[in-house]
């Protein structure tokens, strides 16, 4: 717990370096703090930052800096019922078009979120990551990964992408990171911890600027606002999360719920993502228009029906009203996310979720 130079930091740093290969590891108290630092340096008015799909804190930190956040999901990501292996991918053609249109002077970096949380936790293929990396390097634009669920994404690559089945999840994760220039991460996801995040990169000048902001806003570079015990737990979590028995159980639990609900006729986002079951609120409540927030209505109904806490991922989170015209712009998708905590739940808990979700659907008239 030393203020500077605690052993816990060096274990954490070595663990992240071994996993990601990045030169500079900067701890923060949460993932959004890493985003804040990154976009404070690289964002700004007139800048455009593309992503397969930005999550809400990423988008908010970009927009607070004055930059514009642009989502470039593949078309199949917007069709919840369509079954495709990698619906989290970025539309490479759209990215190339944007790079040509705006130029490197207006695009300070390209982001890629793995797995794609705002598109139902869908995975991104290694091929897509590689192609985005190649495109960024051809334009000399840095490529950063939002690595919150890197291990789950690597598991999907292992089980779905040709030529990857014989490789370990850790090796696949290391390859993913090798195509990037840096990453942000929230430890509450695939760090398996209650708090913490980090910003990692190879660029020396960018790292120095980031540490300068870190000291003002988060803490010393060897703790970043975290207690030593949290850094120690974070390091341990990053080692445990690539365990394939853990990942198999984790992913199968989500698949189980999606399969059961789909068989009951409940509109779910397919195929099952990694960290959560996503209900298609637009199909669930077709009579509720986006300005009346079908996802939020469904989230409330699930709590009343089965005591199930969920999260709206739709127009409450991503919708906006044009200040000039007053016109409402809904989110691309209207969903409700049911994200189980890691490790504590058994199949009986999953069955309770099925009963609650299915019961709510059955009561609709």
Give the predicted meaning of each segment.
Residues 282-310, 323-331:
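Active-site loop ensemble at the mouth of alpha/beta enzyme cores that anchors a bound cofactor
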Residues 254-255, 269-281:
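Conserved glycine-rich beta-strand-loop-beta hairpin in the small C-terminal domain of fold type I
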């Amino acid at each position: 717990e030393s203020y500077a130079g605690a052993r816990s930091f060096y274990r954490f740093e070595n663990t992240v370096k071994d996993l990601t290969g990045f030169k500079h590891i900067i701890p923060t108290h949460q993932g959004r703090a890493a985003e804040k630092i990154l976009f404070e340096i690289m964002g700004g008015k007139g800048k455009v930052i593309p992503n397969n799909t930005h999550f809400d804190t990423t988008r908010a930190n970009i927009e607070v800096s004055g930059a514009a956040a642009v989502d470039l999901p593949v078309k199949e990501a917007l069709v919840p019922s369509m079954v495709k292996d990698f619906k989290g991918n970025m539309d490479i053609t759209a990215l190339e078009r944007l790079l040509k249109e705006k130029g490197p002077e207006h695009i300070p970096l390209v982001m890629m979120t793995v797995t794609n949380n705002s598109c139902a936790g869908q995975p991104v293929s290694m091929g897509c990551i590689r192609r985005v990396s190649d495109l960024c390097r051809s334009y000399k634009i840095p490529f950063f990964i939002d690595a919150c669920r890197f291990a789950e994404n690597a598991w999907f690559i292992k089980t779905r992408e040709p030529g990857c089945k014989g490789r370990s999840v850790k090796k696949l994760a290391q390859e993913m990171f090798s195509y990037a220039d840096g990453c942000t991460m929230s430890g509450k996801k695939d760090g398996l911890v209650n708090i913490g995040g980090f910003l990692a990169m190879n660029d020396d000048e960018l790292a120095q600027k980031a540490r300068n902001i870190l000291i003002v806003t988060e803490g010393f570079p060897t703790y970043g606002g975290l207690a030593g015990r949290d850094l120690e737990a974070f390091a341990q979590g990053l080692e445990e999360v690539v365990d394939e028995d853990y990942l198999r159980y984790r992913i199968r639990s989500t698949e189980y719920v999606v399969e059961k609900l789909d068989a009951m006729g409940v509109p779910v986002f397919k195929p099952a993502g990694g960290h959560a079951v996503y209900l298609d609120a637009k199909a669930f409540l077709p009579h509720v228009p986006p300005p009346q927030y079908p996802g939020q209505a469904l989230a409330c109904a699930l709590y009343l029906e089965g005591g199930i806490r969920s999260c709206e991922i739709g127009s409450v989170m991503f919708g906006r009203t044009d200040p000039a015209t007053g016109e409402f712009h809904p989110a691309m998708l209207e969903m409700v996310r049911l994200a189980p905590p890691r490790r504590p739940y058994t199949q009986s808990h999953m069955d309770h979720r099925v009963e609650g979700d299915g019961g709510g659907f059955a009561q609709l008239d």
